[in-house]
Amino acid sequence: MWASRDHLPEPDLGDAAPPGSPSSFWTSGLPRQERSTSRQRSRGSPSSTCVPYKVHALATFECSATSHASRLWQTLQQFWADHISRPFSPRRPPLRRMPSLSTFYLLDHNTRQAELGLAYGAPCMRLSNQAFVFRGGRWTTESQLARTRSPLLSRTAWGWKAQVQRSKSQVLLEENNYLKLQQELLIDMLTETMARMHLLEKQRNPEVIPTAAARAGQRKMRKRAGASAGVLMIQPCALDSQ
């Protein structure tokens, strides 16, 4: 393959080259300097056209890279704010209402133990149609155990009933005292209200009470006069009948 003319070395023959030399054919009658400048222009023209394209591509890549980095940073900040930076503050449960509580919490320890305490029974066993109970380190029949436990059970039941009666009587006494206090307060309020009402009536109508008293006196006088006239009318009739 033949090499192109652009890559062949040029011999240094000075300013003048003899006719028939290779340089005379390559120059084709053009000066040496003009040929070199034209060659430089032809070589520099493609690079000058490629530079703006490369700059534009680099700027586009930088913009896309910065936008992608900013998106990643925003996503990381949002994740940090949602999951890590917030303090742990769980929601408080709703408050328990008093009516939902059982009334056994108001009782004393002994009553609660008697009502809600666990009562484990003694181990039992049955042999040949007879029941045995292990209590006090020995096996006893159920009939003997019933005889021995009957007074104990009666005492404990009586004591528990007496305690319940005491607590009930105490509650009733407190309720009675509270009702008495309310009754006295209502009576005082009623008395004060009646006194205010009479005072307002006197201030608004001061002549009502005297007129009412006068009317009552007139009625009494009329009754007395009617009674005396009736007596006088009866006397002549009585004399005629006699």
UniProtKB/Swiss-Prot annotation:
In this chain, the stretch annotated as Leucine-zipper covers 172-186
Enumerate the Pfam families for this protein. Answer: Chibby
Consequence of mutating G117A? Reduced interaction with CIBAR1
Q: Where are the transmembrane segments?
A: none
Q: Where in the cell is it found?
A: Cell projection, Cilium, Flagellum
List every stretch annotated Disordered: 1-49
Tell me where it mainly resides.
other
UniProt keyword terms in alphabetical order: Cell projection, Cilium, Differentiation, Flagellum, Spermatogenesis
**What job does this protein perform?**
Plays a key role in the correct positioning of the annulus, a septin-based ring structure in the sperm flagellum, serving both as a physical barrier and a membrane diffusion barrier that separates the midpiece (MP) from the principal piece (PP). This positioning is essential for proper sperm motility and function. CBY3 interacts with CIBAR1 to form a complex which localizes to the curved membrane region of the flagellar pocket. By doing so, may provide stability and rigidity to the periannular membrane to prevent membrane deformation.
Q: What else is noted?
A: 'Chibby' is Japanese for 'small'; the gene was so named for the RNAi phenotype seen in flies.
Please give the family membership noted in the entry.
Answer: Belongs to the chibby family.
Name this protein carries in UniProt: Sperm annulus positionning complex subunit Chibby3
Species in which this protein is naturally found:
Homo sapiens (Human)
- Taxonomic lineage of this organism? Eukaryota, Metazoa, Chordata, Craniata, Vertebrata
Question: What gene does the UniProt entry assign to this protein?
Answer: CBY3
